[in-house]
Amino acid sequence: MAGVLLRGDEELLTGRWQGVVVLAVVLSGCGNGDSMESIGGPTMGSTYSIKYVRHASLADPAQVRREVEGILAEVDRHMSTYRSDSDIEQFNALPANSCQKMPASVLELVRIGEQLSEQSEGSYDLTVEPLMNLWGFGPQGREEKVPSAAALAEVLQRVGHQHLRIDGDQLCKDAAVEVDFNSVAAGYAVDRIAARLDAMGIHDYLAEATGELKAKGKKLDGSPWRIALEEPRDDQRVAERIINVDGYGVSTSGDYRNYFLRDGRRYSHTFDARSGAPVLHDLASVTVIHPSALMADGLSTLLLILGPERAWDYAEKHDIGAFFVIRADTGFVIRTSKAFERFSGVKTD
């Protein structure tokens, strides 16, 4: 967590992830034996945090921790591009015209990725890992640099979901493509955690992993879970909007944390798979609110790739709750989709 702020008799935890701050009242308990519990720890190169209201008959924090960390370990084992023994990295190491048996979770995300790729006309794609490495952002990246046209053309031959095929329980490829689940894996993990908490009888919680989150129910005092959406800037923390969240996942994607500058141009880690280059437009960040944390995760990346105009049209067409922060000469311009206003509850500026 980034720090603790005191306001009157409330203690507010502020956790800074990518573009969101969680405002959570910390209370020791009520006379009925209920209490607010909090667990967290490292995961997938980052952290996770779970806050939930524990009623007297519900699972203790140690049991919740075991369940949550079991899910996170499974997702990491199947989908991490930063460990050579993960299922997806073993697949990535295979040559063209190979197949590998995969767990159902991996095949599910491949199908979701194909859907998002088709809906974005190929701009979003799960097979961008070779591009990430070429530009210096990926797990195999050696140096942040602008590649030559020849090097880019060679790598683009190994990019595109059309090179993937699901055959029963196997994932196959007809080119030496490499899959990167970083735009969907954490959201998937959060959905799995939320489902497990529900199954354990926990219905008031906020679950977060590597910045993707989902909230349901109320806090201990009956107030809603509140999320602050920050301006995409590094010099200070400014909340653009505060939203109430109940039953939705929230994800923010931006170009302001992982980038490099060359000749006055900003090159971020978000790629348009069609060109093979980082996006170059004025859309600084996108926050998506969606019933599925997985879809919020993937859609926030998709919309960031599309840019301010295409992303707006896409969000309106598909009824997506999206909060856009666009760079302008005088600072930032905010634009929200109709669905965002409908989904996000009471808000304050």
Where are these regions (language model features)?
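Mature catalytic core of soluble alpha/beta enzymes
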Residues: A2-G8, L13-G15, L27-D349
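Sec-dependent signal peptide recognition
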Residues: G15-V22
